[in-house]
């Protein structure tokens, strides 16, 4: 009886040691982080893993969402600019986008621009044209452009490594459309955002400017 009890104790100690060893095992960190690469097949990889993978990059992660009230797990910026396009082809129509400067609603805004039948949005059309391999894209809101501006210093070199257009610093080459209309002037103006300085500028919607989809 005593011998059987001793064997039982030894067995229990061995099991506890095995559990303890398992608890300290190192696992690879697969969490999505800023500067990770979004590939055309939907995979998100670190830059080091992307280089080995042979996959095609389409965007670079620049922000991870921590808030439950914000849609999606995070944001990735498209590698290339959209050539200058007008927000709308005519003045006088509110296109149904938000005028809230704090809302992370670029996806909803872009769909509203695209779906407005009383006026045509060359900008929204050009963004919808770049959808491929199931990867959606949209024009960021003012709030989302602020997040991109805050991450520019770390994200832009990775964009360039992937063969994309680096986020600009030049004063005269840094203005991009947002999908946010100007409050009280929704029928005529929307906001431009400077990725050079973080400044904003209300602008007639019929003017052609670049966009950087996310």
Question: Where are these predicted regions, by residue range?
Answer:
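Short small/polar-residue motifs
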Residues: 3, 56-59, 171-178
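An exposed tryptophan-centered "aromatic clamp" motif
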Residues: 120-137, 142-195
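Sec-dependent bacterial lipoprotein signal peptides
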Residues: 1-19
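Short, compositionally biased
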Residues: 21-133, 205-214
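Solvent-exposed, polar surface segments
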Residues: 71, 180-214
């Amino acid at each position: 009886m005593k011998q059987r009890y001793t064997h039982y104790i030894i067995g229990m100690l061995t099991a506890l040691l095995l559990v303890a060893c398992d608890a300290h095992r190192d696992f690879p960190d697969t969490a999505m982080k800023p500067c990770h690469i979004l590939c055309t097949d939907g995979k998100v990889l670190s830059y080091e893993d992307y280089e080995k993978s042979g996959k095609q990059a389409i965007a670079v992660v620049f922000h991870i969402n921590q808030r439950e009230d914000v849609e999606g797990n995070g944001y990735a910026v498209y590698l290339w600019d959209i050539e200058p396009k007008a927000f709308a082809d005519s003045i006088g129509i509110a296109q149904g986008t938000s005028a809230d400067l704090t809302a992370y609603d670029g996806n909803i805004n872009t769909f509203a621009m695209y779906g407005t039948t009383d006026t045509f949005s060359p900008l929204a059309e050009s963004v919808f044209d770049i959808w491929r391999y199931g990867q959606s894209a949209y024009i960021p809101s003012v709030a989302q452009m602020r997040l991109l501006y805050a991450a520019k210093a770390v994200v832009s070199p990775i964009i360039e490594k992937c063969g994309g257009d680096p986020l600009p610093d030049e004063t005269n080459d840094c203005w991009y459309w947002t999908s946010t209309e100007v409050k009280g002037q929704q029928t005529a103006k929307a906001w431009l955002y400077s990725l050079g300085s973080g400044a904003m500028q209300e602008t007639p919607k019929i003017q052609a400017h670049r966009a950087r989809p996310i």
